[in-house]
Amino acid sequence: MALLLILALAAAAVYLIFFRSDSSQTKRITQKTSITLETTAPPSVLYQGTIPMKTELTLPTEPASLPADQVQLDAQPVLQNPELPTGCEVTALTAALNYAGYPVDKVTMADKYLIQSDPYLTTFGEAFVGSPHNSNAWGCYAPVIVETAQNYIAAQGGNEVVQNLTGCSLKTLLWEVANGTPVITWATINLTSHVEERYYWTTPNGEDAVFLINEHCVLLCGYDLNANTVTVCDPLEGKVDYDLDKFEDRYSLVYQQAVVIRDPDKMQSGETETETVTIMPEIDAQ
């Protein structure tokens, strides 16, 4: 009987030493993990929706045909590096402003006029998130470039009209070029076909901040229908020709975003520069 009592006491001691200790350790680990999750930024995840884009209420009508088979505008490329490693959008805007007669440089545009925000506070359609001087920043969408351009032109006392042409066909953009207006156009880096919608955070207003991985911005300034090419001022490459069909596909992958800066006399009848609506591009998440 004494032996059984001793064995029972020994078993109880083993339980207290190992099982209670392990349970306490597990509890501490769980609590630590919980604290970490509460303070960690939301991860980048594949977004399964589409991004609503703001565009003009009345878009230019797609032309039945282009007035010329070949057009080359004398737009000069502006390179984003080394000063603006993630500033392709504001660099393309700078090239467009230079063409319109404004001798502004990309750094001035980035530092004084580009609408910027810290992460977590806004979406990429409302501000450039991060700093274009930082290689780890993100970028922005067409509405940000529209407002940035409008602010700059107003500060200079100019009367050029800035229009968001998001949703227009590439043929419509080529019509703009044929009529003397280069187009700030979103495409992809090196025309890669790999594009992903990535969710990063939800803003205080409840909007999802979703960025298109590999998005890029160029200034469309020419085309050659016979060679099936478009000419762009690429902030990474300079003035280059790209295959027209491939460029059109990449333009569609990033929701057909485009912006023009032009004289009011070049606006088509019925166009407006003030009213906006929200459209949902019919592009599935990659």
Model segments located where?
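Active-site-adjacent structural segments surrounding the nucleophilic cysteine of cysteine proteases
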Residues: 2-5, 10-151, 155, 189-191, ...
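Short loop/edge segments at beta-strand edges and connector loops
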Residues: 73-75, 164-167
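Structural recognition of the beta-strand scaffold that forms the well-ordered cores
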Residues: 87, 162, 182-186, 219, ...
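A mature extracytoplasmic/lumenal domain signature
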Residues: 92, 166, 187-191, 222-224, ...
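Short linear loop/turn motifs
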Residues: 110-114, 165-171
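...with weaker cross-activation on analogous glycine-rich loops/strands in unrelated enzymes
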Residues: 151, 155, 167-186, 192
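Loop/turn elements at helix/coil->beta-strand transitions in domains of secreted/extracellular proteins
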Residues: 156-160, 179-184, 227-228, 256
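Noncatalytic regulatory segments and standalone regulatory/sensor domains
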Residues: 199-212, 218-286
